[in-house]
Amino acid sequence: MGFNVDLSDGRGESRRERAALERAVATEKCIVAARVVLREHSVFDLSASVVARVAGLTRQTVYKYFPTMRQLVFALADELTVGFQKAGVDLDVEGPDWPRLYVDAVVDLLLADPIPNRQVILVSASQGRGMAAATAGTSREILPVMEMRNPVEAERAAWLTLTLFRGTLFTWAAEQLSDEALRADLRKVADVVVAQREIWNTATSGSGEA
């Protein structure tokens, strides 16, 4: 008769937990340091030694989690993606003001740290990730809203909206539009969503009456 005996003492799990915590702390320090550098300089000034000095880490630690500065910039882009996702979490997607409220939340996020964010958007676009890297969260917000109105045309309408959205962000990043211009242009994109909803509502009402 065999016995199943647990010989583990929990040290392996503890080591994994410590490693995960160390990674989270170190990567956060690197990301914060990168933003500090980008506020005063450009992405061309990012290096493991510079980030390490600002973050209070060793170069080896920076290299461990970000072997290249490209990966660090991508981490900043991912941070924007999460921010875009969170921007719509508490909004009522059925509300008539949802598109504008979402846009305003996105603009507030971008303008909270505009100089690094401009560079992150441009570099992520030029380094193989495209605008999708910094705006992926937006598609997760817009497409479900469209699908609730018209599942058949939702993907096409969302593609149009996202194209306009990304184009506006890229123009802001490349041409340094004013804060007011960014908000105004993104609100125009929001108005496209509102107009599309109205068209679908009218079509639905018309088919119902028929």
Name every feature range the model reports, one short phrase each.
Residues 1-13, 140-144, 148, 174-210:
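C-terminal peripheral helix-coil segments that are non-catalytic and often amphipathic
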Residues 1-41, 45-54, 71:
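Basic, helix-initiating cap at the start of DNA-binding domains
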Residues 38, 70-80, 124, 131-134, ...:
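Alpha-helical DNA-contacting segments of helix-turn-helix folds
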Residues 45-47, 69, 149-150, 196:
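Short glycine/proline-centered loop/turn elements that form peptide/ligand docking sites
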Residues 55-66:
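Short hydrophobic/aromatic patch on the recognition helix
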Residues 75, 86-114, 161:
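Hydrophobic alpha-helical connector segments
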Residues 88-91, 120-124, 172-176:
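Secondary-structure edge/capping motif, primarily at the C-terminal ends of alpha-helices
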